[in-house]
UniProtKB/Swiss-Prot annotation:
Family: Belongs to the ABC transporter superfamily. Aliphatic sulfonates importer (TC 3.A.1.17.2) family.
Gene3D superfamilies: P-loop containing nucleotide triphosphate hydrolases
Record gene name: ssuB
Keyword Isomerase: no
Enzyme class of the recorded protein, top EC level: translocase
Catalytic activity annotation: ATP + H2O + aliphatic sulfonate-[sulfonate-binding protein]Side 1 = ADP + phosphate + aliphatic sulfonateSide 2 + [sulfonate-binding protein]Side 1
Protein task: Part of the ABC transporter complex SsuABC involved in aliphatic sulfonates import. Responsible for energy coupling to the transport system.
Name of protein: Aliphatic sulfonates import ATP-binding protein SsuB
Annotated InterPro entries: AAA+_ATPase (IPR003593), ABC_transporter-like_ATP-bd (IPR003439), ABC_transporter-like_CS (IPR017871), ABC_transporter_ATP-bind (IPR050166), P-loop_NTPase (IPR027417)
Amino acid sequence: MAPRLRRNLSTDTDTNTTAAATAVATLERPATADAQHTADAQHTADAQHTADAQHTAETAETRGADGAAIRIRGLRRTFGNHTVLDGLDLTVASGEFVALLGRSGSGKSTLIRILGGFDGGISGEVLATRQRSVVFQEARLLPWTRTLANVTIGLSGRDVAERGRVALAEVGLAGRERSWPVALSGGEAQRVALARALVREPDLVMLDEPFGALDALTRIRMHALLQQLCRRHRPAVLFVTHDVDEAILLADRVLVLTEGRLSLDVPVDVASPRRRTDPAFDRLRSTLLAELGVDELAEGDH
């Protein structure tokens, strides 16, 4: 059965995610109690919104779309006189892993924010599965809340704690339920963010450069973990990255976003296990780098 989708993601938000449309990158602890309360409420709302982006309110039209997790037609988003997304068309099938490449400012993160319900002011048709989660480059954990509570934020039911423990075990953090976020490494914090996304059993997971701030060895480990989790849970994945090799290693299909539209859409026809020494890998890398306007000698920048 095709998944049910919903239209016009920017129309309304669930009461659990009200007043948290923008991200809080860094929070400095205020000096006064009133300021503390205000900042805590904002950070809590932001983490809640990150965890529960899939709970955008229903509109009148809800329908299937031939097994698609995402279907976008003519999406346009402008900021003042600047057009970021210009008539974008995109379909992502249920269970498909799609990587999205593009230069800085090409609209990749804007697209993720629209699909996650963080950004409005759009025109065009945007459909996405009702159960969806977002993982950002920053883990966005509440620093004054223990790991398990960060994973289960916004959930209810008698089995919530057990579901959270299972999710943490899946990402290799069994026994860390009572750890404070400050005690976690960067890789561990991103594992918690993955657990928080997957504990909701989403049909669609969107990842916006989730491993960009990690060291090379940790990135390799996170690649293996993400592949394992995707095989187990089978969500559709929209994965934003600047790393061409990362896109080829992980995805079924790679897209390039240029000036608000998809300029390239190619399948990853590279045998598994994928190796950078494979001629097919090298050919696809060259194609993608050329589309991005990057000299292969500078590919490390991507």
